């Protein structure tokens, strides 16, 4: 038991140190700063940004969405089994079967997606309502013609950047807490180390991409450092929570609430990935095949990590 506790404390420190290192590197190392880059250096950073977009895509689909769907399905199955115990007749079994087959996980993820959509729409309405509708329309459609065949496709509005960055950090924070919680709840040393290594690889890639993203949208060093520090603390906090409840039985309501929160976080993450990160990285038509390869490589990294996560 003492060995297991020591391993988990070591994992906690490793998560904190690695996350801080990976997140702060693209913020404070001048080589990663897009504003000062020219020529070949600028192209390399652009392709690196596409790779980070693939990492976000893989994290959203292969990790956050997959884990949310699995968790919600498992909790719904437990709920149906507990409520159908002792029931008689085929009608009750058929009703329970149809109850389980409903796509609750997809519904929760979609609710997270539409929640951020609504939040952003309200923010834009408040910001641009006094200026009239023409300003917003020109901002959104001024850079494109006839289904995007103009040479300068539209990119996401800069006014949306801070809000979407905040949504990205919040969704990642939720997910990081649950990742740390999973490590803290492991019952053996081998399982703890295996899961921690997978989380370290996943977290390192994602947080590096977050640091790169914060630098590209012009976030100040102090605010970017605060964001990375907050994100770095989430997995250790989750692991510490797992240590406190490891050995105690978790209630059904607690498990369902965790699964629902993971689903909402996955939906918000997918919204930011598809409507902010990918469009911004692919807006420039330069070297489209190279950008595709980098996005695919980033996704492949996360898909490979999913074998052990």
Swiss-Prot record:
Disruption phenotype: Deficient mice do not reveal any specific phenotype, however these mice are more susceptible to abnormal embryonic development because of zinc deficiency during pregnancy.
Keywords linked to the UniProt accession: Cell membrane, Ion transport, Membrane, Metal-binding, Transmembrane, Transmembrane helix, Transport, Zinc, Zinc transport
Residues engaged in binding Zn(2+): 175, 179, 202, 276
Record topological domains on the Cytoplasmic side: 30-43, 125-164, 213-225, 280-288
Tissue: High expression in the liver, skin and ovary.
GO terms assigned for molecular function: metal ion binding; zinc ion transmembrane transporter activity
Catalytic activity reported: Zn(2+)(in) = Zn(2+)(out); Cd(2+)(in) = Cd(2+)(out)
Pfam families in the record: Zip
Provenance organism: Mus musculus (Mouse)
Transmembrane segments: 9-29, 44-64, 104-124, 165-185, 192-212, 226-246, 259-279, 289-309
One GO BP: keratinocyte differentiation
Protein known as: Zinc transporter ZIP2
InterPro entries linked: ZIP
């Amino acid at each position: 038991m003492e060995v297991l506790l020591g391993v988990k404390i070591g994992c906690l420190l490793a998560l904190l140190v690695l996350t801080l290192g990976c997140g702060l590197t693209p913020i404070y190392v001048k080589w990663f700063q897009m504003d000062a880059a020219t020529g070949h250096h600028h192209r390399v950073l652009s392709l690196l940004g596409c790779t980070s977009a693939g990492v976000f895509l893989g994290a959203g689909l292969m990790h956050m969405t997959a884990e949310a769907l699995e968790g919600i399905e498992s909790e719904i199955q437990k709920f149906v089994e507990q409520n159908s115990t002792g029931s008689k007749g085929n009608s009750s079994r058929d009703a329970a079967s149809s109850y389980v087959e409903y796509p609750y996980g997809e519904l929760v993820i979609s609710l997270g997606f539409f929640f951020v959509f609504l939040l952003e729409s309200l923010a834009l309405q408040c910001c641009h309502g006094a200026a009239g509708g023409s300003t917003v329309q020109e901002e959104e459609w001024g850079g494109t013609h006839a289904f995007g065949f103009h040479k300068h496709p539209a990119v996401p509005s800069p006014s949306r950047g801070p809000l979407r960055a905040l949504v990205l950090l919040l969704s990642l924070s939720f997910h990081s807490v649950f990742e740390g919680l999973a490590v803290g709840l492991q019952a053996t040393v081998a399982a703890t180390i295996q899961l921690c290594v997978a989380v370290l690889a996943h977290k390192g890639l994602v947080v590096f991409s977050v640091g790169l993203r914060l630098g590209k949208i012009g976030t100040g060093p102090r605010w970017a450092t605060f964001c990375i520090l907050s994100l770095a603390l989430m997995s250790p906090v989750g692991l510490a929570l797992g240590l406190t409840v490891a050995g105690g039985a978790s209630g059904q309501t607690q498990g369902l609430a965790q699964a629902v929160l993971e689903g909402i976080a996955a939906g918000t993450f997918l919204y930011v990935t598809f409507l902010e990160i990918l469009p911004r990285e692919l807006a420039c038509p330069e070297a489209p095949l190279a950008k595709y390869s980098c996005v695919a490589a980033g996704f492949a990294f996360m898909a490979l990590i999913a074998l052990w996560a």
